[in-house]
Amino acid sequence: NIGAVKLTILFTIITVCNANAQQNNLSYAVAWKQTAAEHRALYYQGFNIARLHVEQALAAEEGKPLAIIADIDDTLLLANDYWGYLISNEEDFFNDTSWDLWVAENSFVPSPGSQEFLQFCANNNVEVFYITNRDQGDPTFELAQQNLNSAGFPMVDREHLTVLRETSNKEEVQRGIMEDY
């Protein structure tokens, strides 16, 4: 009987350890992003430094008008719920199909400090340009525009939003904007 009890306990320990070893690694990253003060602080720090640079450029009043060029996903808009969705569906890596469906649901939240920073820019006549390399087919532009508008960002129109569906390289568009700003 003692041998059977030891064997049962050993089997239980092995089963629990094996279950823990198979836990989705995304859960650690998502938990950190959703709860860590450092995560929020890093966003605020980045946008505060950017604001300082804009203030300095405004004070210098040199040459061309000023502009900000921003990426959208994980820069201005956070998709924490999407990563939670992957975990709950036992997926452990980004999935284009589920991402495309999720983008249309418009469940993004603005990153900490992003709205305030871009509103500061708009209030000070600094043009705000958005560039993304999303591809959700034909409605990609409208979806990106809807996501940004829902989050309350300024200057979200055809002149200020560029969607690159064929490439992830944003340099050519950035150079084009920098010719005028």
Regions found by a protein language model. Give the residues of each.
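Non-catalytic pre-domain segments flanking phosphatase-related domains
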Residues: 19-70
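C-terminal cap/substrate-recognition subdomain and adjoining C-terminal extension
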Residues: 22-23, 37, 135-181
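Second-shell loop/turn segments in exported
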Residues: 32-43, 100-108, 130-136, 161-165
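Active-site neighborhood of HAD-like aspartate-dependent phosphohydrolases
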Residues: 40, 58-67, 76-109
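Solvent-exposed loop/turn segments at secondary-structure junctions
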Residues: 75-77, 83-84, 126-128, 133-138, ...
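Short, acidic loop-to-helix structural element flanking the phosphoryl-transfer center
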Residues: 96, 100-129, 136-137, 142
